[in-house]
From Swiss-Prot, chains A, B:
Belongs to the class-II pyridoxal-phosphate-dependent aminotransferase family. Histidinol-phosphate aminotransferase subfamily. It catalyses: L-histidinol phosphate + 2-oxoglutarate = 3-(imidazol-4-yl)-2-oxopropyl phosphate + L-glutamate. Its cofactor is pyridoxal 5'-phosphate. Homodimer. The keyword Transferase applies. Its EC number is 2.6.1.9. The gene is hisC. This is Histidinol-phosphate aminotransferase. The modification N6-(pyridoxal phosphate)lysine is found at K227. CDD domains: AAT_like. Gene3D superfamilies: Aspartate Aminotransferase, domain 1, Type I PLP-dependent aspartate aminotransferase-like (Major domain). InterPro entries: Aminotrans_II_pyridoxalP_BS, Aminotransferase_I/II_large, HisP_aminotrans, HistidinolP_aminotransfase, PyrdxlP-dep_Trfase, PyrdxlP-dep_Trfase_major, PyrdxlP-dep_Trfase_small.
Amino acid sequence: MKFNENLAGLVNYEAGKPIELVVREFGIEAKDVIKLASNENPFGTSPHVVEAIKSAASNAFLYPDDSYFELKEALGAKFGVGTKNIIIGSGSDQIIEFCLHAKANPQSAVLMAGVTFAMYEIYAKQVGAKIYRTRSQEHDLAEFLEIYEAHKDEISVIFLCLPNNPLGECLDTKEVYEFLKRIDEDVLVVLDCAYNEFAKFKDARKGIESSEILKFKNVIYLGTFSKAYGLGGMRVGYGIAKESIISELCKLRAPFNITTLSLKAAIEALKDEEFVTKTLENNLKQMARYEAFAREADIEFIPSYTNFITFKFDKQSASEISQNMLKKGIILRDLKSYKLNAFRITIGQSWQNDRVFEELKQNLK
Amino acid sequence: MKFNENLAGLVNYEAGKPIELVVREFGIEAKDVIKLASNENPFGTSPHVVEAIKSAASNAFLYPDDSYFELKEALGAKFGVGTKNIIIGSGSDQIIEFCLHAKANPQSAVLMAGVTFAMYEIYAKQVGAKIYRTRSQEHDLAEFLEIYEAHKDEISVIFLCLPNNPLGECLDTKEVYEFLKRIDEDVLVVLDCAYNEFAKFKDARKGIESSEILKFKNVIYLGTFSKAYGLGGMRVGYGIAKESIISELCKLRAPFNITTLSLKAAIEALKDEEFVTKTLENNLKQMARYEAFAREADIEFIPSYTNFITFKFDKQSASEISQNMLKKGIILRDLKSYKLNAFRITIGQSWQNDRVFEELKQNLK
């Protein structure tokens, strides 16, 4: 059977390894596995949210209120925007998909950083769009502008990952706003702010404000409940933009794109800012330990504005170290699929990080 | 901002009205609302599954095992197929999307019944494909073949909805297999079996067997946990086909397309066949009451092989009746968006149906 041409060039996203796999492959008990591979919240889910999910569990048979009325009202209040400026996705990933399916096509191109979130390219290829990347791995807006100017007739979508997954760096907000002014209003600029809570907490100059975003006719802010809000497994993300953008993206949203329990969980998660603050505080404190560890062990790292840190290797193989750690029940994220000799470690709780340091030491030469 | 051309022709799917809306608009308490609009399971979710969800609630922060290993093993055992013959979707809806994004394009056409599940057309339009429908509202394979033969060079996907939503009729399996033999191996035939458990229970001649499906190189079977398995709100569906089809569709599946709790719920739901049997038995028994009611009230209906029945009207307005019922807290599904003067009623529990009959009587002239 012949399939659409675009499929020929597609490869699947390589997800972080699940705990179940370590249990299956290495016979380690689930409770002894430390998963720091997928940037989930090391404190789990807020206990209030867990209770809310339990209370709503018997509604699993009911489709959700597809207007997502209550969630949009709550997000609208938090960000100071109207409900018509909000779209809900199955993770912010799905809104990335909507953006590309709405604006990119085989005649257009998509611009992104040299090394950035893999799903941008995957979705862009699904619609047959061309990809431009900056030479630098990290975001460099001068390079973005240079490529943009050279291929203005082609580029229909630009991605800025603020902060950048999987590297960790983050552009200054002021720079970003200046950049946005240079971009034609017909080009959609996606500000992927999945980790922006962490960046803003570390340094206010990295925080993207939705009120500023709504000044632009061609910019969308993406946020998620997967990281700081502790709901990675529930798949809820959101986009904030002018109504003229949101209403078009909504045409691509299938009904019931999040689950009934995800909807409930997200609404409850927004009420527990204390949990988020605890998460952000732990992250900052434990991040300092990783930096100190790396300096002492002479490992190259990128100062991170996220809830993970990426260690780069020169002589040793990062894949080999990751694999050794895996056998000990510690799951890190090998970045081989990003063509890097590096791995990414989610910042865990103190006791988890202790074990990481201990095992890592055994593996460093 | 200009968007891709395909978006111009798109309208959103009109979902069944949620309980929350009736509460908001008519001030009726949620506990007094009877929702028979979206073909959810009137017994809710199996108590065993509800318990499993509660036990897993604290895992909401963890991404699911993206291989869906355990669920695929369980489905494979149930259907007697390999795990590589299975793809998991966010509802079977999402697999409809994958099929169309993989096989349809602006140069191709999609063939379906005169009145059938709205998402086929919506997803087909997303990729700019042309739509052919049979003249008859219900499935008529002679008409399908006639159109297929006349537009063989264009048609890349054919949908058969077995049984058909929102009408309720169901083709005989034997007829379907004969039809499949007449279709070129490069055309993907999608057998949407979301309600097939109900059809098979009523009449064995309507049951589609996955072992038969795997004999064809170009056929995919779609099943769901939303109806007989009582998990509409959890969004889990599956496709079964030759590995050559599944592996291509998997290229379009984003990681973590179902939630951690949905995965758990689906695995547990497969273990409780008793709940499914109870559901099917109630459905058959209560369906007979709806048929008797319709005959007595002289309402036209299509004998249904699903968990709903569609009442067609001639003189009275189905929309008006639906709206009156809504004010009384009973949510039916007006089929105006399908261009029918009809409404669809999910077969409820006995006490729910009593109330429907009572209120309907007040509205019939």
